[in-house]
Amino acid sequence: VRRNGRMCGCGRQGCLETYTSATGVARTAREYLTIRTDESKLRELDIDTITSKDVFDAASVGDALALEIFESTGAILGEACADFVTFSSPEAIIFFGGLTKAGDLLMNPIRHHMEKNLLKIYQGKTKLLVSQLKESDAAVLGASALGWEAKEI
């Protein structure tokens, strides 16, 4: 995603995960708090232990810095979604994981930036959905799908 970006646990740099996961949101918060002077409820917390839940809680009560963190995260993920839509034309993209609990705080910026970065021909055609599956169910269904795929081969 980002050339010379953040180091990822996989050993590469700039992976989408480092910006748009729960850990990525917490990392963005720590970066913003280090380089900026904006007032924020997040400043009341230990910078080394800030979580995405802390950012969500602050954003939920209108904290401008926390809202900007979700906007920035949504912009990065929205741009990536636009790229994905351009080469694959899916009917929908289904989001999954703990960060989706942020709801519209995350999904609205994703939707806005995806649409903004799409060619006109693709705009308004791809649904962005949040999975209702439990994490344990998703793992089982994913493993099952691999079995179905192998059987078809």
Model segments located where?
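ATP-binding/phosphotransfer module of carbohydrate and carboxylate kinases, centering on a glycine-rich
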Residues: 3-7, 12-153
